[in-house]
Amino acid sequence: KKSSMYFKDLKKLENGLKTLQKDENIKSILLFGCDKNSANAAELEEVLRLNTKPLLGGIFPQIIADGELKEIGFLIIPLFEELEVSLFETQENISIETQLETQITSISREAKSIFCFVNAFWEEKTSFLEALYDELGPVVNYLGGGAGSLSFQSLPCVIANQNIYENAAVIGLTKSPILIS
């Protein structure tokens, strides 16, 4: 089985997501897209609604697929372990710290690794990352990055399950250590 799958457009991504839903071995999905894709957030969310597995990721200026730099398309990385996906976004009366304290459950405290994607232009990104580290500490493996566009305009770029968000971050926790080879 391939460790990643590239789709050049939204229709092909839709077909790929439908196929992944049938594979019981795939427990979670990482999804990365390019900001030059012709699909808007609403069109992407329509396709994401087909997914029933934990999913997280982001929109970036470029992705690497099949050893090539791509400025258009989507990349899926199927995972064989279930992730606990949590979204954090700007809310009027709830601080990021409070959101983290509420969402990081006792199960989360057993996490060995965390995927984290944050809008690079989100005003609260530094507060979020500091609070996340305060909550989970140095014993967790962190993997992720800042999503967004080289246009330096904030846009919906953080993907969590069936939706895409603008002023937000998403994490996926797993009890297994992430190994990069």
How should these model regions be labeled?
Residues 1-181:
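Cofactor- and metal-binding active-site motifs of prokaryotic enzymes
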